[in-house]
Amino acid sequence: MSTDKTDVKMGVLRIYLDGAYGIGKTTAAEEFLHHFAITPNRILLIGEPLSYWRNLAGEDAICGIYGTQTRRLNGDVSPEDAQRLTAHFQSLFCSPHAIMHAKISALMDTSTSDLVQVNKEPYKIMLSDRHPIASTICFPLSRYLVGDMSPAALPGLLFTLPAEPPGTNLVVCTVSLPSHLSRVSKRARPGETVNLPFVMVLRNVYIMLINTIIFLKTNNWHAGWNTLSFCNDVFKQKLQKSECIKLREVPGIEDTLFAVLKLPELCGEFGNILPLWAWGMETLSNCSRSMSPFVLSLEQTPQHAAQELKTLLPQMTPANMSSGAWNILKELVNAVQDNTS
């Protein structure tokens, strides 16, 4: 860190808005940004890398992943080939998030001592539309649970999460199912389709994610692994048909992502996870454990959601960043967004 007197340590809140697609996250984030617009240089909004997804070295990940399901249903591609194509397109979503996350992490002051307090204004806010955990865990796991991907594709996505710096505040956004279906139908992104089983599973998986983070604060995944049954077709169908996963104040391992990660393909003869995948599970656990989870309803207006998000700020975990690093981050974000406009 620079010793220049103008390069001072600041309190920063790193906030990631996440959740199922089409529920109004981006609109809520923009409204939150508008709320703080009266304070120049106070908040930095990092949008979804949509244009990169639309043209990642010449491939459109969004049209590709949804189009593959249409081709499979029409009989234009075999189920096995469709699973391979889906895994390919899902991997394309990961790269922009992972690269940006690595740049952000490198700019953070990761020391846990002498945290600058953020309970007194002004402090900086970095608001990101999604965390890499969306493209590496929540969406691929949901694709697997509806049969769009094979289990062989999961470890390369689930267990390769980047290290998580201190001060990650993950805000999972929710709406009622009727509102969700209405909103995602109206936004009509090119190539995007509405598949009810996938939407339902994704909603369940995000609740499992919150339960997982809470569970790992006081437990480890080893403790209850042997009590879990294998994730079978009956459980998968249940996840596709109802909102069967409930948010728990004190979740058990059966309420977490580990309930769907206990797959025969990842385990040995007696249900023990194979060593390589066990190490990967530790990576996933360490990343999740480092987060502070929150839930934000988007059921009402974007203005109401922005106000509700503001009320959560005092509960969030701060991080440190130098003023110089903050300026570098702004330049990086502006450069990326300028090239995707």
Swiss-Prot record:
The keyword Nuclease does not apply. Changing R130Q: In strain: Isolate 7-1-3. The keyword Zinc-finger does not apply. ATP binds at G19, A20, Y21, G22, I23, G24, K25, T26, R183. Its EC number is 2.7.1.21. GO terms for biological process: DNA biosynthetic process; TMP biosynthetic process. Catalyzes the transfer of the gamma-phospho group of ATP to thymidine to generate dTMP in the salvage pathway of pyrimidine synthesis. The dTMP serves as a substrate for DNA polymerase during viral DNA replication. Allows the virus to be reactivated and to grow in non-proliferative cells lacking a high concentration of phosphorylated nucleic acid precursors. Phosphorylates and thereby activates certain drugs like acyclovir (ACV), valacyclovir, and famciclovir to a toxic form, that leads to successful suppression of the infection, while the uninfected cell does not have this ability because it lacks TK. Mutations in thymidine kinase may induce HSV resistance to antiviral therapies in immunocompromised patients. The most frequently observed resistant strains are unable to express TK and are avirulent in animal models of disease. Belongs to the herpesviridae thymidine kinase family. This is Thymidine kinase. It comes from Varicella-zoster virus (strain Dumas).
